[in-house]
Amino acid sequence: TFLNNQKRYKRYFKNYGLVFNGETNCYPDKDLAVAYPHQDKKYKYLNAGMCMGRTDFIMETFPKLKEHFTDYEKNWSEQGVWTNIFFDYLKKYGDDNPITLDYDCKIFQCLWDEEWGRSANFDIVYNKNKIYNKLTKTEPCVFHTPGPTCSDSQVWKIINNKYHITNRSEDFYEYI
């Protein structure tokens, strides 16, 4: 779902070839969690469900994607494959990695929160026009409900004030 201004990509990520959604769940290989850069960030793991990038870079990367998928036993998940490519580029380019994550939810907001569970991300404040992340102090323009158990129907209810909350927290509505 798109909210806000889609031109943010150029403003925040013009020096990168590809930007992935950052999330709180290190999936599918939890052993890689300690290898990710920016350990101080909450949204530090790659989520392949949302990405934006330059067409030339993406087209150049597709053969690498195909190479990784040749071993299905090892690489059965597109998120795992993109994670491997991310780490390949990180090893090769270091801080100049052309692939990055949206660590501060400037564009993408993943609704999954590993700390609280599926669709229960308490960093987010919803209103009819925007979502606001209190932790990162950003207004992401795209939100993503990953996996089969994370539902945007709950988000729709909140945004449209159809979620019957009997004990409304001031904190929940402070940004509305």
Where do the protein language model's features map onto the residues?
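GT-A fold catalytic core of metal-dependent nucleotide-sugar glycosyltransferases
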Residues: 1-28, 49-52
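Hydrophobic transmembrane signal anchors and adjacent membrane-proximal interface regions, especially
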Residues: 11, 122-124, 133, 163-165, ...
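Structural alpha-beta junctions
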Residues: 13-19, 88-100, 165-170
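Short C-terminal domain-edge/linker segments immediately following a structured domain
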Residues: 23-26, 54, 82-84, 173-176
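Short acidic/His/Gly/Ser-rich catalytic and metal-binding motifs that mark active-site loops
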Residues: 28-31, 62
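Short, flexible, basic/aromatic active-site loop/helix in glycosyltransferases
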Residues: 30-41
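Catalytic core and acceptor-binding pocket of nucleotide-sugar-dependent glycosyltransferases
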Residues: 43-157
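Juxtamembrane luminal stem/stalk of type II transmembrane Golgi/ER carbohydrate-processing enzymes
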Residues: 151-176
